[in-house]
Amino acid sequence: MFTDVTSKAGINFKYTIGDFTYKNILESSGSGITVFDFNNDGLMDLYLMNGAYLQGISDPDGKVFKNAHNELYKNNGDGTFTEVSKKAGVGGHQWSEAAGAIDLDNDGYQDLYVLNYGPNIFYHNNGDGTFRDITGSLGLAGPEKLNGFTKWSIGVSFWDYNKDGRLDAMVGNFMAFDPSYKSPGTPDLMPSPAEYNGQASMLYEQLPNGKFIDVTQKNNLYFPNSKCMGLTVFDYDNDGDLDIFQANDHQLNFLFRNDDGVYKEVAVAAGVAANDQGIGTGSMHASIGDIDGDGLIDILVSDLDHGALYRNLGNGTFEDITKVSGLASEMEGKGCWGAQFLDYDNDGDLDIVTANGTAEELILQYPLLLENDGKGHFKNVGKEHGSYFSTKRSGRGLAVWDFNNDGFLDIIISHVDKLATAALLKNEGGNGNHWLGLTLKGKNGPASAIGAKVTVTAGGKKQVLINQWATSYLSNNDPRLHVGLGLQNQIDQLDINWSDGKKEVYRNIIADCYLTILQGKGLVAK
């Protein structure tokens, strides 16, 4: 059962869109969510993106929202949160879409990279509850314009693309938004994304001096008219290299296969470029996980039609099982934005939660909680699991986390409807199933931990997990790995394939706790 505890928790965030009227595609995109522990107290905190008034885009009446800002909620550990964005120095009055939390300099504290319509901002965590803007020294603001219009960034994935031990960053950019454009046939309606040009996503390489340079074209990743809505980095073909899935809006998706540092776009050949009708839809992002227990990582792509579920066949290709899995009938016409795999009942298989709402107009939809039967077939059980799932909303960003550290995954969803509030859904748990939470730390920082593959064996059952939390629309999930164990109260064996190629094995791990594993040193903290 999920209980809406938003008000009780003190989360008073309201998405403003910088306006009173909902009239353009920028305003329809919604608010991103980032889960991270900014003060290292073992409790996950929350960063919510907002849209401030934009001169020349927002209606003049929207000037009352010129001071709208992003909000940082510190977890108090008692089920409540305190908003501390101004004290921490991460409020800002820009139009923000998403943020990536990462310990860039390996000082033990999570930094924050905020992606905006306009210049991006990188906040360094000072370790005392405050942040400072170091964007200029890093070179991560991004270009002022792309394809002739203001740069519109929607997300970031960090990983060590060239295996030099330093974190690099790929920034997803969406489209060349012309605020003055009106559709010829329907000038009073919001234009479709298909009517605009795109903007190239950009790969930034970190140099030994800590600065970043644009290496997009050098790595065959430059597509100047693409319309990225989400980036997911993982090793889909099990060759030891991290690949890139780019979800594109009203275009074919991209899958950049990494062969020893050389990228090639293979989405069509791999079977993940389009939906089951061969059409590039309004893809939002990709969530990854093994939905049928075969040890291979599958891909869930949310879109405004019925989404796509691609089953990994283990030979570098995927099979579209959206219909046979039951997803097509459950998600048809819902307008899905955020969608995420999670084992909400800790029974040892991955379920799905979605945030829904029609794009062009504020047509509300029911959110979905889709139960996995263990074989990759899904059924909506939302209305049986809380009143939120019986209430139509217009959802956007969605993150899965465990805010109270009880081992049962909670959910937070942002909205662009008239309420425009976030919804914190507490998982009441109570079924007696066991679980394990895991934080991976690489030997020399996050570089060898991001994208690492973890195989958990308990009671003869194997589950494969990928250490990647940037897998939701505009949002970052709880950075800790979570695995449901059903009735098993210990893990017999835990295998880690680190992203730098190193391998480690651990045995006989007691369940129902959060652990930290430091590469080369083993279990270092609970």
Language-model regions: role of each:
Residues T3-S7, T82-K86, R132-L138, I213-Q217, ...:
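Beta-propeller fold detector
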Residues G30-N40, K74, W95-Q110, H124, ...:
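Beta-propeller blade termini
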Residues M49-F65, F174-Y196, T354-I363:
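Short, conserved, GDST-rich strand-edge loop motifs in beta-rich repeat architectures
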Residues D19-F20, K211, S329, E360-I363, ...:
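Gly/Ser/Thr/Pro-enriched helix-cap/hinge segments flanking short amphipathic alpha-helices
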Residues V84-L104, L115-Y161, A176-A194, G198-A200, ...:
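Asp-box/WD-like beta-propeller blade repeats and closely related beta-sheet repeat scaffolds
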Residues L43-N50, D107, D111-N116, A169-N173, ...:
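Hydrophobic beta-strand segments that make up the repeating blades of beta-propeller
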Residues I11-G32, K66, A88-G100, G139-S157, ...:
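Repeat-based blade/solenoid architectures
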